[in-house]
């Protein structure tokens, strides 16, 4: 019959168990079984600790045998790493990692080094006072420090040189890679630390702008020679440089400009929405006025279940939704949107009112037009001065009142004739009264 040891992670609530044969299991074997069962990995990045749930005492001895039917608490914490000079030189990072759970995965128990105790004289503490014991403690520490200094003086010093400075120095040696540019002078044949202008205190950099934050679709490549251009010319042409070392200029965003123009046109089209606002029409009848908006009724609807008053459709729907379907006029509840009935007769009255307003508005505009413009509108063909002998109806008679147009006689085209090469062109009479005042032949 197999034995069982119950365990539970400190951050969990459920309890698991490990099955084994025997009366007990060592701490080393228990940790290895827990790591394998929970698939915790190779153990290089954490350390596993086991505690007694009653006394919260850690089982730190791997050889300690835990009896069967025992419950333990398991805690996983980050590994403690300590790098030494020898581990860096050898390149063995795993050997430098201390305090992890690797040995439980590989099956190698922990090997403890024997500490070399220095020969110290232990004074007989029996029968001594507290001051004598303190003095003896300080004397022991001084002896240990002197022995440590003697060992350090005989040890061979090991010097470690950082590899980062060496690599960075080697990277900037030799010719620069393709695409590199010195941002001080604009040259591409040297590193910026080797720029010949570093020793010139009067040198002013070209101040080449970079394209940070600008999308590539708004950049256009150009070919220039930075050695032959002054900083003022580059700033005037707004030349920038990319990460690849290419010179570019910024182009306009046509798409955004077109979108702006389109939105502007839409706003102008939406200007017709002002006819539904309050105060747009000064002579608006009360029966065509919306009780909610105070303006002209727009898509008039009625509340069939209560007061049966006309409202604008959109305004009434918004008011019902915001007030939990309560009529804004008579405060009747449960007025649903499906109960709204369109008022066709009222909509026709609204259309008739708008047509009258358009006619009045159009007539007021026509009344402000000059007399010459009215004549051109009434006689767009320009046939008033084709022939002096031809009596054509004019748009304005001697009294100044307009007369209805009369059909032209048969054979006369409705447009002015072009002069023939063998006949001189006739003078165009702009004033219709001149035709009456001219002498008849």
Swiss-Prot record:
Domain DWNN span(s) in chain numbering: 5-78
SMART domains: DWNN, ZnF_C2HC
Modified residues (Phosphoserine): 221
InterPro entries for this protein: DWNN_domain, RBBP6, Znf_CCHC, Znf_CCHC_sf, Znf_RING/FYVE/PHD
Ranges that cross the membrane: none
Region (Disordered): 355-400
One GO CC term on file: nucleus
Keywords: Metal-binding, mRNA processing, Nucleus, Phosphoprotein, Zinc, Zinc-finger
Name this protein carries in UniProt: Protein MPE1
Source organism: Saccharomyces cerevisiae (strain ATCC 204508 / S288c) (Baker's yeast)
């Amino acid at each position: 019959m197999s034995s069982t040891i119950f365990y539970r992670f400190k951050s969990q609530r459920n309890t698991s168990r490990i099955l084994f044969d025997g009366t007990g299991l060592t701490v080393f074997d228990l940790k290895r079984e827990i790591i394998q069962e929970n698939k915790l990995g190779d153990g290089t990045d954490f350390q596993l600790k086991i505690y007694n749930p009653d006394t919260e005492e850690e089982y730190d001895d791997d050889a300690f045998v835990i009896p069967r039917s025992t419950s333990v608490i398991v805690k996983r914490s980050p590994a403690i790493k300590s790098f030494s000079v020898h581990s860096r030189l050898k390149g063995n990072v795993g050997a430098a990692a201390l305090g992890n759970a690797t040995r439980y995965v590989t099956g190698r128990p922990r090997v403890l080094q024997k500490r070399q105790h220095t020969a110290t004289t232990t004074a007989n503490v029996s029968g001594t006072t507290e001051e004598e014991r303190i003095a003896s403690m300080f004397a022991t520490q001084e002896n240990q420090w002197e022995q440590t200094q003697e060992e350090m003086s005989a040890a061979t010093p090991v010097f470690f040189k950082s590899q980062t400075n060496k690599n960075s120095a080697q990277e900037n040696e030799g010719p620069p890679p393709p695409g590199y540019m010195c941002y001080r002078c604009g040259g591409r044949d040297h590193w910026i630390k080797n720029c010949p202008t570093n020793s010139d205190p009067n040198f002013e950099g070209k101040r080449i702008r970079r394209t940070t934050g600008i999308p590539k679709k708004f950049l256009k490549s150009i070919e220039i020679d930075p050695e032959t251009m002054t900083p003022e010319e580059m700033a005037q042409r707004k030349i920038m440089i990319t990460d690849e070392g290419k010179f570019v200029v910024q182009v306009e965003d046509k798409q955004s400009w077109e979108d702006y123009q389109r939105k502007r046109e839409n706003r102008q089209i939406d200007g017709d929405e002002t006819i539904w606002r309050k105060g747009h029409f000064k002579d608006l009848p009360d029966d065509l006025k919306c009780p909610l908006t105070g303006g002209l009724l727009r898509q008039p609807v009625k509340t069939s279940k209560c007061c049966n008053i006309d409202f604008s459709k959109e305004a009434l729907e918004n008011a019902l939704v915001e007030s939990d379907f309560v009529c804004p006029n008579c405060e009747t509840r449960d007025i649903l949107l499906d109960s709204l009935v369109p008022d066709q007769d009222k909509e026709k009255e609204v259309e008739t009112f708008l047509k009258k307003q358009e006619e009045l508005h159009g007539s007021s505009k026509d009344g402000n037009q000059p007399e010459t413009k009215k004549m051109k509108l009434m006689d767009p063909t320009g046939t008033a001065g084709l022939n002096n002998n031809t009596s054509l109806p004019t748009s304005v008679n001697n009294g100044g009142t307009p007369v209805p147009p009369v059909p032209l006689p048969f054979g006369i085209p409705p447009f002015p004739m072009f002069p023939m090469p063998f006949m001189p062109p006739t003078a165009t009479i702009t004033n219709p009264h001149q035709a009456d005042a001219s002498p008849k032949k």
